[in-house]
Amino acid sequence: MNSVLGNQTDVAGLFLANSSEALERAVRCCTQASVVTDDGFAEGGPDERSLYIMRVVQIAVMCVLSLTVVFGIFFLGCNLLIKSEGMINFLVKDRRPSKEVEAVVVGPY
């Protein structure tokens, strides 16, 4: 029971003290550099290999998202182009050439 009370007062003293040593202990206490594995060796932050793998995965995800956006814009543009051609053809079918134009075209040949 006294050890628990002692630990609480140590922590309170750590944060209430104005000395640089107390601040240093508080910072060391809560960083990844102070994590100790079962073997007794301190484990640092993520190693180079895991950072490389994370970077490759990020690049792959960004490439897939970029391709999705590019193809989405492309197919949307194609769809709009097809619809506009259909509307133009609809308007062209409504126009009828006059019979005089046909007579002139057929005449000289």
Curated annotation (Swiss-Prot):
<comment type="function">
    <text>May be involved in the regulation of p53-dependent G2 arrest of the cell cycle. Seems to induce cell cycle arrest by inhibiting CDK1 activity and nuclear translocation of the CDC2 cyclin B1 complex.</text>
</comment>
<dbReference type="GO" id="GO:0007346">
    <property type="term" value="P:regulation of mitotic cell cycle"/>
</dbReference>
<dbReference type="InterPro" id="IPR043383">
    <property type="entry name" value="Reprimo_fam"/>
</dbReference>
<dbReference type="GO" id="GO:0005737">
    <property type="term" value="C:cytoplasm"/>
</dbReference>
<feature type="glycosylation site" description="N-linked (GlcNAc...) asparagine">
    <location>
        <position position="7"/>
    </location>
</feature>
<feature type="transmembrane region" description="Helical">
    <location>
        <begin position="56"/>
        <end position="76"/>
    </location>
</feature>
<keyword id="KW-0325">Glycoprotein</keyword>
<comment type="similarity">
    <text>Belongs to the reprimo family.</text>
</comment>
<protein>
    <recommendedName>
        <fullName>Protein reprimo</fullName>
    </recommendedName>
</protein>
<feature type="modified residue" description="Phosphoserine">
    <location>
        <position position="98"/>
    </location>
</feature>
<keyword id="KW-0472">Membrane</keyword>
<keyword id="KW-1133">Transmembrane helix</keyword>
<keyword id="KW-0597">Phosphoprotein</keyword>
<keyword id="KW-0963">Cytoplasm</keyword>
<keyword id="KW-0812">Transmembrane</keyword>
<dbReference type="GO" id="GO:0016020">
    <property type="term" value="C:membrane"/>
</dbReference>
<feature type="glycosylation site" description="N-linked (GlcNAc...) asparagine">
    <location>
        <position position="18"/>
    </location>
</feature>
<dbReference type="GO" id="GO:0051726">
    <property type="term" value="P:regulation of cell cycle"/>
</dbReference>
